[in-house]
Amino acid sequence: MKLLIVTISLSVIAIAFGSYLRIGTPKTVEAETAANLLPETVKFRIDASKSRFMVYADRTGVLYFKGRSHQIAVRDFDGEAALSLNALNPASLALNIRAASLEETSDVYTQKEKDIINGELKGIVLETEKYPAISFKSDEVKGEFRNGHFDIKIGGDIILHGVTRHIVIPATVTAEGETLHAKGEFSLDRKKFNVNATNAFHGTVRIKHKLNFTFDIVGERVQ
């Protein structure tokens, strides 16, 4: 009789254990369900050739230089953006800029003046041999979806002139088919990054502290 009871008990335990293995623990089921509910993330590679990234520096000075601002184009940059096409998060942005690719584009300057500005931009302002890269990496994305686009604020760390600061970049983002489009603007205080003001043209020009950035960036979907 005892042998029969033991046999039945072992059978019940075996059946229960088998059911446990097939079904899994409640935590496992919850984790699998949560994973299935996560939005699919799509990656886009930034295409500098189709994008526009500008830096505007207002100036004060004397004589005919007064009131003529700098329009600096960022020529060489790359990076990757990731987001869900039907939800704001998860989302991220990583951007790398070759500092030596920045150059004056304003048509108010002669080519000789542009050469002077570009030389000081690389040698004095950005010190590109010492600090060849400018980078940004997001750690938080907030915002909402409205009228077919995302209005977002991208928080993250920017490294400029060897100094790391946390900034927030507002942007309007749309994704259509294979293409991502992001537009926006933000500003930085050059003094917080130990960036020198150039004194081109024998000291007649002085750049203000505030640098204004505008971007119209295109990314192509990574297959």
Predicted regions and their residues:
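Hydrophobic membrane-insertion alpha-helices, especially the h-region
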Residues: 7-16
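Low-complexity, acidic/polar, glycine-enriched regions of mature
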Residues: 16-223
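Positively charged n-region of N-terminal signal peptides that target proteins for export
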Residues: 1-5
